[in-house]
């Protein structure tokens, strides 16, 4: 009888140890999970601050607009002063003519790149800002002259999103692209020599706060 009670006592003690180990393990896992969430949340929340810090080296001030239709969706989309806002990007129309490579370098020095056009709506917005007597470099080029066009930010070149003028592109030696107004087809893309001088359009992603 005594042995049976001792055996039962050992069983209860062993069971308690198992439960204690399980509870401790769960607490440790929960703590690790919470810590991970906090680190991830902090990392995500820090992104606007880091981007703002980066832009501050190029621009002295930003203009921000309230975006979203509901209170819970409200956020601020910011662009540097004098840049145009559309969708998730900011655009700056250059007032100086330069070579394609120099134009890209000028954009990079402002935390941007030559414009990448992804939709017809974006093309239409951009052309509304342009002077019809000028042409503007885009961030599109064919470095090897083999007809493989590529965007400066490595966005895949889509055959469904292209706005060439009729009969363009027409020369393999013309390896860069400008957007220009030609009657009667209006605004469209034209392949040009990269060492010819044109105005340009810079693009950067908006900052969201």
Swiss-Prot record:
Q: Which residues of this UniProt protein bind alpha-D-mannopyranose?
A: 168-170, 174, 182, 190-191
Q: Where are the transmembrane segments?
A: 21-43
Write down what this protein is called.
C-type lectin domain family 6 member A
Ranges facing Cytoplasmic side: 1-20
Q: Quick one: which residues bind Ca(2+) 2?
A: 168, 170, 174, 190-191
Q: Which SUPFAM superfamilies match?
A: C-type lectin-like (SSF56436)
Provide the domain comment: A short stretch of the intracellular domain (AA 8-14) proximal to the transmembrane domain is required for association with Fc receptor gamma chain.
PROSITE patterns under this entry? Answer: C_TYPE_LECTIN_1, C_TYPE_LECTIN_2
Q: What is the effect of changing residue 17 to V?
A: Does not affect association with Fc receptor gamma chain
Q: Which pairs of positions does the record mark as disulfide bonds?
A: 64-78, 79-90, 107-202, 176-194
* Residue ranges that the UniProt entry lists as topological domain Extracellular: 44-209
Q: Where is the C-type lectin domain?
A: 86-203
Tissue specificity remark? Expressed by the XS52 DC (dendritic cell) line (at protein level). Expressed constitutively by the epidermis, and skin resident DC appear to be the major source of this expression. Expressed in the spleen and thymus. Expression was undetectable in non-DC lines, including macrophage lines (J774 and Raw), T-cell lines (7-17, HDK-1, and D10), B-cell hybridoma (5C5), a keratinocyte line (Pam 212), and a fibroblast line (NS01).
Assembly behavior: Associated with FCER1G. Heterodimer with CLEC4D; this heterodimer forms a pattern recognition receptor (PRR) against fungal infection.
Indicate where this protein is primarily found.
Answer: membrane
One GO BP: antifungal innate immune response
- Chain residues that bind Ca(2+) 1: 116, 118, 122, 203
């Amino acid at each position: 009888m005594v042995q049976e009670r001792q055996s039962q006592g050992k069983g209860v003690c062993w069971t308690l140890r198992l439960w204690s180990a399980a509870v401790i393990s769960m607490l440790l896992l929960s703590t690790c999970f919470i810590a991970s969430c906090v680190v991830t949340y902090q990392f995500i929340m820090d992104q606007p601050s880091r981007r703002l810090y980066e832009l501050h080296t190029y621009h002295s001030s930003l203009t921000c607009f309230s975006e979203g239709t509901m209170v819970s969706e409200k956020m601020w989309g910011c662009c540097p002063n004098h840049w145009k806002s559309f969708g998730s990007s900011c655009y700056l129309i250059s007032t100086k003519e330069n070579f394609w490579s120099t134009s890209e370098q000028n954009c990079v020095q402002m935390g941007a790149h030559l414009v990448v056009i992804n939709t017809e709506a974006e093309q239409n917005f951009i052309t509304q800002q342009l002077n019809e007597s000028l042409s503007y470099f885009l961030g599109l080029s064919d470095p090897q002259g083999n007809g493989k066009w590529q965007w400066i930010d490595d966005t895949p070149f889509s055959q469904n999103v292209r706005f060439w003028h009729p009969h363009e592109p027409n020369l393999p030696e013309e390896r860069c692209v400008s957007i220009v107004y030609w009657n009667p087809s209006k605004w469209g893309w034209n392949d040009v020599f990269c060492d010819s001088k044109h105005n340009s359009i810079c693009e950067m992603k908006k900052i969201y706060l």
